[in-house]
Amino acid sequence: MLTRLKVSNFKNLVDVDLYLGPFTCVVGPNGVGKSNLFDAIRFLSALANHTLMEAAAAVRDQDSRTAHVRDLFHRVGDHYAERITFEAEMIVPRRAIDDLGQEAEASITFLRYSLELAYRETADSLMQGNLAIVKEELVHITHGAAPRHLLFPHSAGDWRGSAMYGKRRAPYFISTTGEGENRVIRLHQDGGSRGQPLSRSAANLPRTVLSNANAAESPTVLVARREMESWQMLQLEPSALRKPDEFSASTRLEADGRHLAATLYRLGRHDGQQVRTVEGSESESQGQAITSQQLRDLASQLELTTQNAARVYSQIANRLAELIDDVHEIKIDRDEKRELLTLHVKNEEGTFHPARALSDGTLRFLALAVLESDPQMQGVICLEEPENGIHPARIPAILQLLRDIAVDTQEPVGEDNPLRQVIVNTHSPSVFQQVPDDSVVFVKTREAIDEEGRLCKKAHFLCLSDTWRAKVSEDAARGDLLPYLNPVLPKNYIEVSKQKRVVDREDMQQLLLSFSG
């Protein structure tokens, strides 16, 4: 869970210091930096598992073939900022698995990761430059300091007591010493002063030290790495949601919606385990006859799995029915011949329709409902403009679903309340008016003077007054919020057409008056 993010000189994010809660709605007009905030989160996530240049490529302008790594740096005219800095405070899970399948347990779960990057020219003028690490640090935040860092409402005993775990005396898990060519990044062992740190020259590091962590050398760093890897941008594609899955497919819902059927099938299996078939039991017995007890055990397992599947599918169908009228049942069809799993939804007429025949909106709702039910889905989930493709009357329902996906900070963290966070952005008045007021972060551009004395524009993040965010953030002006409360301007405000607008109709005006009255 990302609780605070500081960014400077990344695109138009300059001196940004943003506190985050379990659910955050970033509101603002186009072009002010809402997407850049998501890009910063995606960039940090990519850096946890890829090289510096691969991570940069993941967030550069996808529409431009000539996009340059330097475009990530804040620019004023022809001048680029020299360095990009990030600082992320996060609560991480207790345990994680490394690339070799080894389990690691964090010695403490409230951490701060800092990273400073510079642009480095190459000797070959035909090649673009590279990114270089100036500083990389990972430190812990103590239990005593937690109330000063976790500003959103939460239960100190139930939620914070379960989310924050462990202790540590030594300050650093990763530290940086020296300057220039002598700069060294040290990976400290979880034993603190008792273990010797592993030192690496920062001069030519192709990736962050955190991205190379494993369970044996640095379990806490590995857990932080896995947490950052889980930060994702959810971009559900109807074509991906409609595809059936092979039996061998991943059972984790991807950011584009792939493996929806396989994920739902996993949730329906008892204890997450695949049902053993009679044929499988025979092969394990190396041709020996199956005993009556084995058959009874297998029948019992099959019955439990069937009951669990019915319960899970019913829960998700009921959730979906709150959002869409024509959904009464869901199931996964298992095609043994083609070895495919296909999602089906039954309508009020009793007809089952495969995923390929479902509407985009239904599939999107279904994916979010599955995500809500999946305890394995943790970390940060970013979603742009959740209102897109949704009927206006359904917007409150999808907003409630997104809020329910996020962790409940009044209850202990556990399988039924995973450490999960949702951040959405929007410029829709319908969304702005219906989210909790303390979840709103308003973005606008503001003129400022950079370090060299040049006039520039940067993203400025504001909040609504009398919310927990007001402790650390400036209040948004009422004039900036007015368009989101009255999305249609008065008739005489600007002459756009001589035709009568819908809002100008007398019956519409009466309807508006009845709501406002």
At which residue positions do the language-model features occur?
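Phosphate-binding glycine-rich loops of NTP-binding sites
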Residues: P22-D63, L363-L371, L401, N425-P429
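Conserved P-loop NTP-binding catalytic core
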Residues: D39-F110, E116-T122
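C-terminal lobe/lid and adjacent interdomain/linker elements of RecA-like ASCE P-loop ATPase modules
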Residues: H353, P396-G517
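Electropositive, glycine-dotted interaction segments
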Residues: I97-S300, L304-T305
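N-terminal pre-Walker A segment at the start of P-loop NTPase domains
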Residues: M1-V14
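Phosphate-binding P-loop
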Residues: D15-G21, S373-Q376, E415
